[in-house]
Structure formats: C-alpha cells, structure tokens
C-alpha cells in the first residue's frame, strides 16, 4: 500500500477498475488503494469531487468517526451521541496524532479513525472546510441473504440482514449462532458465537 501511495502521491486523480463475478458481486481489480483495501489503504482514499457539507453529511462524518472507533453495532443516534461526547478526543487526535497515538492506535480501525477525526475536526468542529471528500464506509450484511430477502420479499429475513430500516443494526450470524447453540454438543456451546459461523 505504501508503494502504491508513493507512486500516486503526485497524481491529481486515478480510477479504480472493477470486476464482476457470475453472482453480480463487484471486486476492485487493484490489490491496493481501493475500498476493499486494508484499514490503512482505505484511510488514504479521497474522492476527486468533494461533497458540500449539509447537516446530513455532518452526521455521516460523525457516523464514520464512531464506526471506525468500534461502534459498528450501535444505533445511528448512539454513534452521533458518542461523537458529541468525545469531541475533546477527536480534536486531540486530529491536531496531534503522534502525541496522542495511544488514543487511536488500539481502536477498531485506527487509520480510518485517524482520517475521520481529522476530517470531522476541520469540517464540523473548526468549520474551516465547507466540503468533504472522505469515503464513508457502509457494509452489506450477509449480502447473499440480502438478495434472497429482496427477491422473496421476506420481511423477517430483510430485517435480519438490515435491508429494512431498524434502529439497531441486526446481525444474522449472531441469530444463527444462538439458534444453533442448543443443537451442538455441550462442550462446544460455550465457544459458539457469530465469529464461529463467519469463517470463510
């Protein structure tokens, strides 16, 4: 990623070519500097055409800060509240990332958190920018089930995989683990959680 970033650092813009498989899934062709890169690689990506700030876009910047910190299972309101209550932390990380690295290097997605803090600080707190080009990460939840729920118009499955609105993000893997646990040998039940089912 560092080699790719060094190679592109003086380029005004570059394009990311995509490949589609037989299921309709899209994959970026480059291994580095793409929306499916590592945390570090994702943190470097900016859109060429910025979006001008609105109250909604400010909320989405806050969403990115909280999500990359580790609140990906929290409601939108909980994430917004967390950002509001942690503005001192966000400002400290944005202004002095080296001096405050212990505040961010152990979070869920440290590099994206650092990038989000810097963007949020300038766009929302300091207001010295009226636009943002930061990539906001949203992720599909068990995309195969999302497609099937949509095709079958199955509302219960759609809710389970976050196709229909819900205050709290749903977790299909956790629900399957809860239902499978009683049917597994007792010595394995303690270890049954969503991660057991989410193995590739």
Give residue spans per PLM region.
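P-loop NTPase catalytic core of nucleic-acid-dependent motor ATPases
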Residues: 191-194
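Short, positively charged, Gly/Tyr-enriched micro-motifs
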Residues: 196-200
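Catalytic nucleotidyl-transfer cores of nucleotide-processing enzymes
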Residues: 2-188
């Amino acid at each position: 990623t560092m080699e790719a970033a060094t190679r592109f650092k003086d380029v005004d813009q570059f394009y990311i070519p995509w490949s589609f498989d037989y299921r309709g899934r899209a994959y970026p062709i480059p291994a580095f500097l793409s929306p499916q890169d590592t945390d570090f690689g994702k943190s470097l990506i900016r859109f060429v055409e910025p979006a001008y700030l609105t109250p909604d876009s400010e909320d989405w910047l806050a969403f990115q800060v909280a999500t990359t910190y580790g609140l990906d299972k929290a409601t939108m309101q909980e994430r917004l509240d967390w950002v509001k209550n942690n503005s001192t932390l966000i400002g400290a990380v944005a202004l002095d990332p080296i001096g405050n690295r212990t505040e961010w290097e152990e979070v869920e997605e440290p590099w994206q958190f650092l990038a989000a803090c810097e963007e949020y600080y300038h766009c929302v707190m300091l207001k010295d920018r009226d636009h943002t080009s930061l990539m906001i990460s949203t992720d599909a939840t068990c995309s195969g089930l999302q497609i099937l729920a949509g095709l079958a118009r199955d509302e219960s499955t759609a809710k389970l995989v976050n196709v229909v609105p819900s205050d709290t993000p749903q977790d299909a893997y956790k629900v399957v683990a809860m239902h499978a646990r009683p049917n597994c040998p007792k010595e394995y039940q303690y270890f049954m959680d969503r991660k057991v089912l989410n193995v590739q």
